[in-house]
A protein has these predicted regions:
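Alpha-helical transmembrane segments and their helix-helix packing motifs
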Residues: 1-260
Length: 260
């Protein structure tokens, strides 16, 4: 049913595996860039959302959601390696027998680490820029981070599933589309839905939570323990959303089976 598209994803995953194994340092730089690119989207939407929250504007969530498409547009069009996208890629390729479980776990671990390093690097640059040095405890950056750090684990897990379902659908649909304008529109809609609905994305949270914690003026509600409280269930949920709801689902509906 979706054989050409599934085969394209599988071939892309094989190339990712080969690039990772042939030159790890270059591959890690690509992962680092994705973490920073997603972080740029986070900085953008919270710069937009903070004054809207202060003004009690009902348009806050909508405008933040409309702006976050920058993140995945940079990841796809500029080129980089995103952990949550690779949840889909390597699930399909491993189910088809083109990569192994070891390849998959190695890739996910390395790309997650690279994304995290990129997010932290960007966060340090933002701290150095002074953009949020006068942010009060009620600033949207801190308010949103504190809520994420205190939310129930089960809710974070399910929000993670829903989030990466949308993110991987954006990548999947963009791969099935030839026109760049169509790709951008599809990315925009899916990321708008993810932000406006309040779902949880591990790579986006790498910048949001790290930046909030690294800012010297952060309130006591922002803690390193809260960072892990959010990141662990969200990451697990993202894996399920991308691997099961998109990767496994579309592989199962196609006739691609263990091709060499």
């Amino acid at each position: 049913m979706y054989t050409p598209s599934v085969e394209g994803i599988i071939e892309a995953a094989v190339k990712k595996r080969d690039q990772m194994n042939s030159n790890l340092s270059r591959y890690m730089v690509a992962a680092l860039m994705a973490g920073a690119y997603v972080g740029l989207g986070i900085v953008l939407i919270f710069s937009i959302g903070a004054p809207l929250l202060a003004a009690q504007s009902p348009l806050q969530t909508m405008l933040m959601g409309m702006s976050f498409g920058l993140a995945l547009t940079l990841v796809i069009f500029a080129g980089s390696e995103l952990f949550t996208g690779n949840n889909m890629f390597f699930t399909m390729s491993t189910l088809a027998g083109r990569t192994t479980v070891k390849d998959t776990l190695k890739n996910w671990g390395l790309v997650f680490l690279g994304n995290l390093l990129g997010a932290i690097l960007l966060s340090l640059l933002i701290v150095g820029s002074g953009l949020f040095k006068t942010a009060a405890p009620e600033h949207l950056l801190f308010v949103a981070s504190a809520k994420k750090m205190a939310a129930p684990v089960s809710e974070l897990f399910f929000r993670g599933i829903l989030c990466n379902w949308l993110v991987c659908l954006a990548i999947w649909m963009a791969a099935r589309t030839k026109e760049d304008i169509a790709k951008i529109a599809l990315i925009w809609w899916c990321l708008y839905a993810f932000i406006a609905s309040g779902y949880e994305h591990s790579v986006a949270n790498m910048t949001l939570l790290s930046l909030s914690w690294l800012l010297p003026n952060h309130p006591d509600t922002i803690t390193l323990a809260g960072w892990f409280h959010n990141m662990i269930p969200v990451t697990l949920g993202n894996i399920i959303g991308g691997a099961l709801f998109v990767g496994m689902a579309y592989w199962y509906t196609s006739p691609v089976r263990k091709r060499s």
